[in-house]
């Protein structure tokens, strides 16, 4: 029976009862999942994402709200704007998860109604794209995305079982007219290809699920075998990967370490052509080169013998502001905050704090804060001018950070650079 199997999945994967945010579309799958959860004592909320792609979306939102009132479950309606540049399906999925991430609470898991037929479709779509074992692993019953835990308790349940349950419980649901549009790859597989395959091989979906499970096992084993080395070279918090030893590794091992690093950083996986570019342009080029590669909303960069992932960076090079004693200023583009005290400047960014100790002669005078400087500059209490490029290199500041590094000036003289790397001190 579907209910008992559902309860078993819930207990197996979450022995301590979780709080659940259910992704509710109003279709038969999510309505059945809502009904199943309602028959447990699980604390439950539901969210409907209004993509604005159908003229019926308002009616579907009203249906979901009424359904949640019937079940006495808190309901969230969230409208989103879909970026169609990467395709409607991908854009809708990205917008949906982004909206859910904004609403889900720290103690909640996300429950979705993906089932066995969806798993088969996902596997075949990955096969069409030429995916490796990670892509062919398809969906997992429990997975993680954007710091969310996602639970798919119906993943081993067939569409027919869901339909039978809905009929037995006399449930009501809506039909999305776009599901019949075979222009979309998933619908083409669902409506035309899989019915033929199931007619020939009735257990085809179960066999696909088995293959996906084998791929998952291979991917997990690979990650386990390389985890120690990845830990040695990668800094996940800073999204950096040290590659000085990669010349001793085979191209396959190089690629797998980069794949695992990107996955841990929750970055979209590059295409095969992009991986070839990473191996040739990032790992095998001269250390004085500064290649970069766009990966969706991130940019892969290299400085010296380290790879870095950076988000889209705003232009901050023209920032210039006076910093007086006992004053606090906010830096642009989330670069942090500076607080001036008589003896020091305190730099705070996220959970990091750094201090620049000021010499006696500068403790009462106004100082100027800049984020960029080129050419030669006179150092405070130094006899000669120096090239900023040399100072940046000495401080090991990557090229793209040189328009985002705090420079403390007294009049036209550079007092020091203030970074997150180390405490700094200037003495008379």
Swiss-Prot record:
Chemical reaction(s) catalysed: cytidine(34) in tRNA(Ile2) + L-lysine + ATP = lysidine(34) in tRNA(Ile2) + AMP + diphosphate + H(+)
Location relative to the cell: Cytoplasm
E.C. numbers: 6.3.4.19
Keyword Isomerase: no
GO BP terms in the entry: tRNA modification
Gene Ontology cellular component annotations, sorted alphabetically: cytoplasm
InterPro entries: Lysidine-tRNA-synth_C (IPR012796), Rossmann-like_a/b/a_fold (IPR014729), TilS/TtcA_N (IPR011063), tRNA_Ile_lys_synt (IPR012094), tRNA_Ile_lys_synt_N (IPR012795), tRNA_Ile_lys_synt_subst-bd (IPR015262)
Keywords: ATP-binding, Cytoplasm, Ligase, Nucleotide-binding, tRNA processing
UniProt free text on domains: The N-terminal region contains the highly conserved SGGXDS motif, predicted to be a P-loop motif involved in ATP binding.
The protein's role, per its UniProt record: Ligates lysine onto the cytidine present at position 34 of the AUA codon-specific tRNA(Ile) that contains the anticodon CAU, in an ATP-dependent manner. Cytidine is converted to lysidine, thus changing the amino acid specificity of the tRNA from methionine to isoleucine.
Family indicated by similarity: Belongs to the tRNA(Ile)-lysidine synthase family.
Record HAMAP family: tRNA_Ile_lys_synt
PANTHER family: TRNA(ILE)-LYSIDINE SYNTHASE-RELATED
Protein name: tRNA(Ile)-lysidine synthase
Source species taxonomy: Bacteria, Pseudomonadati, Pseudomonadota, Gammaproteobacteria, Pasteurellales
Gene: tilS
